Swiss-Prot record:
Source organism of this protein record: Histophilus somni (strain 2336) (Haemophilus somnus)
EC number per UniProt: 4.1.99.1
PTM-bearing positions, type N6-(pyridoxal phosphate)lysine: 270
Organism classification: Bacteria, Pseudomonadati, Pseudomonadota, Gammaproteobacteria, Pasteurellales
GO molecular function, one term: tryptophanase activity
Name of protein: Tryptophanase
Enzyme class, spelled out: lyase
Length: 471
């Protein structure tokens, strides 16, 4: 099938869910009731749901069948060992703690690593800084709740939608090392490598960049955590774009990548394709003390360490999903679907970030130049898209980034992006064409779209529950 312009979906659809069609008047009222916040809409009022790919896609038949093998023992479940063995095989990590989802892992490892740095290196909590190529929102939130200042050190091309770069998710290595020296290595409890880099547009990190970042971390004895939600997509981009690895399999690239971290935290609801589940895993006995402390916290916060808030069937399904999500033909189809959508949007004059994994990212700042960043242009665009076509999307910009917890001032955002997140094996090319057609209508009315302001603003992770109004 190498000579075809577009590959069809590499699966057969066996079960379908009917969706409700609504009128423009209905949607206008629904978004007002939701406080101009698409997180607060009811799912039955959504025609195409592009809010997230986290737990919203289809599962494979093998994943569904694996549920029947579930051992629901409170401790020592054989389903736990099936999952732990999958982690060893895929990532090469010896110690596994399952969690209900990614943030369950974050709320465990972050305070443990801070405490360890404080006890062993004399970390000053008033000067504590953590670094990433770009923190995911909950990772940032947990870090800030534990008193850390977060610092994203990304390359200059990362958010420039006019520039193509094979690895826009890369660390700016010079800024990383300068930042460590500036605050003092003892005040840096961890570095997070986010793959793919969601906030930059699902952009990958090269293996060369991972290696160099890890060398810096080793130099200053700082542990590296791999934020692994989209590990398989990142491996695919390495295979396709990093010449040294063009003949490697996805499995080989994945295993190699995880040599350049000390632990992984994962929302398994993305590339592992499950509707619920997460992982916190440690490479070897160099992190055994951290692992033991995290197991203790897991009991209190998630559940016994051999189930971590998951039923046995869910752990079996996750063990299969980790492998299924790395299929070469699957990843090729998934990335080509994103590319098709981005190319279609750009043909009608809608500027997008370079195609990455899991989503198309529209440059809302360029589509709505009359709306300043403090009036959240990407959120305003999301509301308009819903009104026009019943499509739910999500803002990745100033609203999500939030305020400086110390000064209360809005943090400067490098780009105002609207994310059109594609759930796995859920929508077809016809849906992509519909989205493009909807944007034609949105673009025609762009100059009339209004900015937004708060009527209710939570202090942490405000984008989830805030309420807004048009200005």
């Amino acid at each position: 099938m190498e000579n075809f312009k577009h590959l069809p979906e590499p699966f057969r659809i066996r079960v379908i869910e009917p969706v409700k069609r609504t009128t423009r008047a209905y949607r206008d009222e629904a978004i007002l009731k939701a406080g101009m916040n698409l997180f607060l809409l009811d799912s039955e009022d959504i025609f195409i749901d592009l809010l997230t790919d986290s737990g919203t896609g289809a599962v494979t038949q093998d994943m569904q069948a694996a549920m029947l093998r579930g051992d629901e023992a409170y401790s020592g479940s054989r389903s736990y060992y099936a999952l732990a063995n999958a982690v060893k095989e895929i990532f090469g990590y010896e110690y596994t703690i399952p969690t209900h989802q990614g943030r369950g892992a974050e709320q465990i490892y972050i305070p443990v690593l801070i405490k360890k740095r404080e006890q062993e290196k004399g970390l000053d909590r008033n000067k504590m800084v953590v670094f990433s190529n770009y923190f995911f929102d909950t990772t940032q939130g947990h870090s800030q709740l534990n008193g850390a200042t977060v610092r994203n050190v990304y390359i200059k091309e990362a958010f420039d939608t006019d520039v193509d770069h094979d690895f826009k998710g890369n660390f700016d290595l010079e800024k990383l090392e300068q930042g460590i020296l500036e605050v003092g290595a003892n005040n840096v409890p961890y570095i997070v490598c986010t793959i793919t880099c969601n906030s930059a547009g699902g952009q990958p990190v090269s293996l060369a960049n991972m290696k160099a970042m890890y060398q810096i971390a080793r130099k200053y004895d700082i542990p590296v955590i791999m934020d692994s939600a989209r590990f398989a997509e990142n491996a695919y981009f390495i295979q396709q774009r990093e010449a040294e690895y063009k003949d490697w399999t996805i499995e080989q690239i994945t295993y190699e990548s995880y040599k350049y971290a000390d632990a992984l935290a994962m929302s398994a609801k993305k590339d592992a394709m499950v509707p619920i589940g997460g992982l916190l895993c440690f490479k070897d006995n160099s992190m055994e003390d951290v692992y033991n402390e995290c197991r203790t916290l897991c009991v209190v916060q998630e559940g016994f360490p051999t189930y971590g808030g998951l039923e046995g069937g869910a752990m079996e399904r996750l063990a299969v999903g980790l492998r299924d999500g790395m299929r070469q033909d699957w990843l090729a189809y998934r990335i080509s679907q994103i590319e098709y959508l981005v190319q279609g949007l750009e043909k009608i004059g809608v500027v997008c970030q370079q195609p990455g994994g899991h989503a198309a990212f529209v440059d809302a700042g360029k589509l709505l130049p009359h709306i300043p960043a403090e009036q959240f242009p990407a959120q305003a665009l999301a509301c308009e898209l819903y009104k026009v076509a019943g499509i739910r999307s999500v803002e990745i910009g100033s609203l999500l980034l939030g305020r400086d917890p110390k000064t209360g001032q809005q943090l400067p955002c490098p780009a105002e992006l609207l994310r059109l997140t594609i759930p796995r094996a859920t929508y077809t090319q016809t849906h992509m064409d519909f989205i493009i057609e909807a944007f034609k209508q949105v673009k025609e009315n762009a100059k009339n779209i209004k900015g937004l302001d708060f009527t209710y603003e939570p202090k942490v992770l405000r984008h989830f529950t805030a309420r807004l109004k048009e200005i």
